[in-house]
Amino acid sequence: MKKFTITVISLFMVLLISLSAVGEAMGTSSKYASNQDYIQSENLALRDKSNKMTDGKDSSVYRFKTRNGGESVIDLGESCDFNSVILKEKGLNVQNFSISVSDDNESFTQIYANDKIEFHRLCTFDTVKARYVKLTVEESDNLPKIREMEIYNAVPEKKNDFRVSTYSTLGGSVFGIIDDTTLSDAEKDAKIKELIDSGYYDTITDYIQIGSVIWDEDGSVKMRYSDDIENKYYAVMMRNLHEVLDEKGVNLVITILNPSGENGNQRVMKSITENRDTLITNMIAFANKYEFDGIDLDWEFPLSQDEFDAYNSFLQELKARMKTEMWNKEDATLSLALATWALKYTPETIECIDYVNVMGYDILDQDGQHSSFFSSCVQAADYIEIQGFSKEQINIGFPFYGTWEGGRMEQYAYNAISEEISPFNNFYTMKKSDTKEDRYTYFNSQAIIRDKTAYAYLKGYGGVMIFSQYCDLPSDDERSLTKAISDYLQEVTK
């Protein structure tokens, strides 16, 4: 089992966020239940006048007669092409559902399955042609209640500027290649390029290099572990990375991590106030040294008003200087990784940010699971937009890792368990040890990654974000999560 640890907020904070998110959702469920403006085509389900799920009224509810295994069939009147279903639940009970189709109302073929419906759930699949559509609730905590089931043949307007950003680390394997004295420099370069896996970058538009570079309270910018890493390894890796990405037309962005740990916020404050000029000079100098196309910042998290006031001022000055001092001038991008709570960015700051990577996957749903469709996609993006960011600035974040219920700090790469879950399954039962009980680990499957991509695309958001690329399978693997993004985008842009 491949295991990796990511710095996340404390369990206490996660639980508070989870409860707050669910509470807000409860209070605004009718808003999301009527959120159907992003698919500009006929709702085919309205042709069936006999079912409360298809009457076009969010106020009415279809009640299943059994918790598990209940079915309802929609008759479209004739065989139709469609590729999307929107489901709207009253309450938060459904834990597993499937969608099947038929032309004779007797023999059904399953085309989709997943776990939760919640207040708003987009389900996407390859275009099918059928007359009858069956919703089966396989498992539910209580009797399922469905407000609406909408069926569409969604054909969105083609976009050429949809972003697919990915956070990625250099990877320890690079060090071994560079240290191998039996290899020539050319052989080392070839092996490093193999690790980069260029196939991803037919889909990815922005590669955000994270984990290597930090700043400190004195305004210095340096390698995270030692200068030897930069001198011996980093320059070689960046040269090879540039060669691969430049050929694909992919932007290369650097995340410069802030001081963290004990008194981390105090150290950040000192750097962005007393040593601001030095810090900005060093950030831009590092970006110019390796010809990064942009700078990305990930302060987790400014909390007080004083911290936000200082950060707002710092970001505005950083962007202004990037326009004149970065090697690519006006084309240089400034991006932020954002949590989905307690943001206090001013309109002036928001205007100078090119895009934000929304870490909605940190929010837990009512069952303590991270990154469900509604909480991490619909609700998270909506919150960021309410704060003043435009749709075009927002990248909706996807986790390529799983974690236990409750947002535990141990997190596991998708590529470690991909052979053991289906494209529709988000759960993996993991035995922690021989002495402890099995635990559910929640991942994002290919199906939900495709659905979230479709939601971002159809709703007009700027793009999506992957955290983290090294958790995925190789680009040529049919089970790759990046492939799920790519397949949808190829379908709508062909």
Residue ranges and their predicted role:
Residues 16, 24-78, 90-93, 152-159:
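Disordered, acidic Ser/Thr/Pro-rich linker "stalks" and the adjacent N-terminal cap
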Residues 280-308, 360-362, 465:
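Active-site groove signature of glycoside hydrolases
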